[in-house]
């Protein structure tokens, strides 16, 4: 299952120095981002997803254009995806941390249930965003992301998953469990029933001891035994959901990196327009222009830095024009600074 906003080439520089040298990211991070930026080598690694073919560059330029022209939706997606990714990672860490420890089964079940529930609810919210904005998610370059998302998690399946996770721990109150369904790869709770533990306890305890008090004690013991059995069954089922959670953790990490990048592009696009910069996203392959910059590639690692004059036969680009001493270079430096900040903390003030 592959879900992403744009393609990324599996490529990395042989030396970190080459990556730093390309656009002087180390200098930007050290001098402009301050203490908030954190581990500079880690940031450089996050920023490193270069494109090497014309089709990849063209595809991503279309996605960047869609992100800039629909910035409010881009920001909503960023907030939802980043939050979902962070919560899922924390939940998986909590699940792993609970294994091998002498914790109550109810506690371990609660950790599993909450992690699964938050993931499914978050995926459902993303699906609803697409349904409410079909003109963006189906008619712009965002469809590359949304089509693959819907293929992996159809709306009908999400409804079933949502109904299941909302009632997954309902047994806590009355001693009853009914779980059934086959829902998604790695998330199958199929034909499983542990029903009416309380009734079984009452029937089993009615003839064990004479007297009212004895029956209550017996019923309670059998009831607790039934609940413990039910907890073990549910915990084993929830453990089977781990592949589902791990798969989405990997997907959401990729989506988070990409949507933060797109949100940074949209933010700088808005900022540029507000101060009077003119943006052009050329389509004619034979065009050439001076002072050619592409918003999507401005902070990416290429074998050679983007020159001042670029032939559009080889790559799409964005033109930034303005009067002499009009702030073009300052804007481009701000773009680099903002991208470093956006990749690390999700926001930037320029």
Model-derived regions: residue spans:
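Extended, Lys/Arg-enriched charged tracts that mediate electrostatic binding to polyanionic substrates
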Residues: 133-192, 256, 260-265, 270-274, ...
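Conserved amphipathic alpha-helical "coupling/scaffold" segments
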Residues: 1-176
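Conserved ATP-binding N-box helix of the HATPase_c
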Residues: 336
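Conserved NTPase motor "head" modules and their coupling/switch loops across ABC/AAA+ ATPases, GTPases
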Residues: 1-9, 13-14, 23, 258-326, ...
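Extended, charged coiled-coil "arm/hinge" scaffolds of SMC/Rad50-like chromosome-maintenance ATPases
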Residues: 213-240, 249
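Short, charged/polar, low-complexity loop and linker segments
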Residues: 93-100, 233-243
